Structures are given as structure tokens and as C-alpha cells.
Amino acid sequence: INWKKIAEVGGKILSSL
């Protein structure tokens, strides 16, 4: 599991809300 990738994608999702 690539936690850095998950965090990056998660951050983009949160910033788009």
C-alpha cells in the first residue's frame, strides 16, 4: 500500500469539497 499516494489523493479530494 502506497500511503503517500493515498494521502496525496485524499488531500486533493478534501480540497475540492
Curated annotation (Swiss-Prot):
Entry keyword annotation includes Secreted: yes
Biological process, per Gene Ontology: defense response to bacterium; innate immune response
List the expressing tissues: Expressed by the venom gland. This peptide is also found on female cuticle and nest paper. The venom could be the source of these peptides, which could be spread all over the cuticle by the frequent grooming movements of the female wasps.
- The question of whether Secreted is a record keyword is answered with yes
Subcellular localization(s) per the UniProt record: Secreted
Q: What is its main location?
A: secreted
Leucine amide PTM sites in chain numbering = L17
This entry carries the following GO cellular component terms, namely:
extracellular region
Q: What keywords appear on the UniProt entry? A: Amidation, Antibiotic, Antimicrobial, Immunity, Innate immunity, Secreted
Role: Shows antimicrobial activity against the Gram-positive bacteria B.subtilis ATCC 6633 (MIC=2 ug/ml), and the Gram-negative bacteria E.coli JM109 (MIC=8 ug/ml).
What family does the database annotate?
Answer: Belongs to the MCD family. Mastoparan subfamily.
- What this protein is called in its record is Dominulin-A
Question: Organism source for this protein?
Answer: Polistes dominula (European paper wasp)
